[in-house]
Amino acid sequence: MSRKGKAKKRKAERLRNKKLIDRYPWISPVNWHWKRIPSYDFTMYDDVPKGWKRAFGKIMLEEYREALIRCNYLDKFQWIQVKEKYGTLRLYSNAAPKEVSDLESKYDHISGYFCIECGRMNVPVLTGGWVEPLCEGFKRFLREEIK
């Protein structure tokens, strides 16, 4: 890809991120003091694995938005860290009302039933001591890659 093409792609990503952050302000990146960074280069939502985004990403963001609006907490809530741990999605945030905290538990639980790569429903697979939520297709793909 040319330099001009890369610049165009980055600009499109920033515009996409700005739209996401405008609608879902808690996905804005934060610094070490949990202060929002005025940047659209990335979002906390970028750390959600692609399979989980496909399976329930938009639904999850909308559920958070509705709960935060009901609790009048939309501008006070912030995701601090997003990651996969022990085969499930972990969403770490600042203090929030119980209704919002319950969503973190909900998505922690249901994420373990979806493939982290493609979003298909699956059963968590134990591979080499690691819990990896992969569907059979991706499990076979990984085996062939290792050979």
Spell out what each predicted region is:
Residues 121-126, 140-143:
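Short functional micro-motifs and their immediate structural scaffolds
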Residues 1-19:
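Short Lys/Arg-rich cationic patches that frequently serve as NLS/NoLS or arginine-rich RNA/DNA-binding motifs
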Residues 129-141:
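Cysteine-rich micro-motifs
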Residues 83, 102-113, 124-129:
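Short, flexible, mixed-charge glycine/proline-rich loop motifs
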